[in-house]
Amino acid sequence: MKTSDFDYNLPQEYIAQKPAEPRDSSRLLVLNRQSGELKSCIFRDITGYFQPGDVLVMNNSRVLPARIKGIKQDTSAKIEILLLKSDGNGCWEALLKPGKRTKPGTIIDIRKQDGQIHIQAEVLADKEDGIKLLRFSDETLLMKLGEVPLPPYIHTPVSDPERYQTVYALTNGSVAAPTAGLHFTPELLERLGDMGVICTYVTLHIGLDTFRPVKEEDPSDHIIHREYGILSAETAAAICQAKANGKRVFCVGTSATRLVEQASSLSQNGIIELYSGWADLFILPGYKFKVADCFITNFHLPRSTPLMLTAAFAGWPLLQKAYEKAINEHYRFYSFGDAMLVL
């Protein structure tokens, strides 16, 4: 298995620049792993694939206003900060743009446009993959100074930043949205609940790996970034009950899937339990899924870890056929694009 196996060509015009309106009007490509059938429909019709007692697991992490603009104190040059992860003590891992010439000791002034809020960031150290360690003079003001970061391939401003949040987003912590969940509306979730589907939530704060291509020739050499996650006792109980009753677990997105699989792999008896901690499970083809029975996801970037997880779940040959069909039928790709359901 090589990283180049997960490459494909996508015309730029297929990259969705705006979200579907309404959310559940996006297209849905359904992959049946047993029959190999590929079927197109509208996302709101996904209800037809659920049965009473099935469990739907969603990631309720909320995207931080992690994009912050500042000015380097020594040169007055503009600089952009993308917050990645806090250490809980006022320091953050971050990406700087431009960043190569920004050395430890650099002071960055950050002001709100009205000038009423002013803090400073000091670059403390260089880390791997171009990441910098920053210390802020007042960490409590960061959320008032930033804006929600959009992926680098989206060039059209979004009029409503909430369109890059799921309708059930709750806990701040991600630098990218769990995009498979962007298709759900409150009404669609209510319909699923009325059908007897158990809607549950986990929290996994999404980091850099969502956009970062795997550069190693052998994907198993890639070190995935750790992301903090919480799986509650209530969600664990719902999953266990579904399994005991012969019902299915539908995971929404690669983040929810990784967290439930990590929690299962760390339990002594293989039964999913309450989990709180770092998630660093890198799922590649050949992995045996223990929790997820069905999988809802978007169309992912070439050579990315989410694409590799999807290939592990669907099977790469079938997934390649699905991507070919999606391109031929002008599906919309990436964060604001259409969705897939893998059964």
Curated annotation (Swiss-Prot):
The protein's Enzyme Commission number: 2.4.99.17
Q: Which InterPro entries match?
A: QueA, QueA_dom1, QueA_dom2, QueA_sf
Q: Which UniProt keywords apply?
A: Cytoplasm, Queuosine biosynthesis, S-adenosyl-L-methionine, Transferase
Q: For this protein, what reaction is catalysed?
A: 7-aminomethyl-7-carbaguanosine(34) in tRNA + S-adenosyl-L-methionine = epoxyqueuosine(34) in tRNA + adenine + L-methionine + 2 H(+)
* Main subcellular location of this protein, as a coarse class: cytoplasm
Q: Does the keyword Metal-binding apply?
A: no
Q: Does the keyword Chaperone apply?
A: no
Alphabetically, the GO molecular function entries are:
S-adenosylmethionine:tRNA ribosyltransferase-isomerase activity
Q: Which GO terms describe its cellular component?
A: cytoplasm
Q: Where does the UniProt annotation locate this protein? A: Cytoplasm
Q: Which GO terms describe its biological process?
A: queuosine biosynthetic process; tRNA wobble guanine modification
Pathway per its UniProt entry is: tRNA modification; tRNA-queuosine biosynthesis
Q: Which HAMAP family match?
A: QueA
Q: How does it assemble?
A: Monomer.
Q: What does this protein do?
A: Transfers and isomerizes the ribose moiety from AdoMet to the 7-aminomethyl group of 7-deazaguanine (preQ1-tRNA) to give epoxyqueuosine (oQ-tRNA).
Instruction: State the NCBIfam families in the record.
Output: PRK00147.1 (NF001140), queA (TIGR00113)
Q: Which family does it belong to?
A: Belongs to the QueA family.
Q: What is this protein called?
A: S-adenosylmethionine:tRNA ribosyltransferase-isomerase
- Gene that encodes it: queA
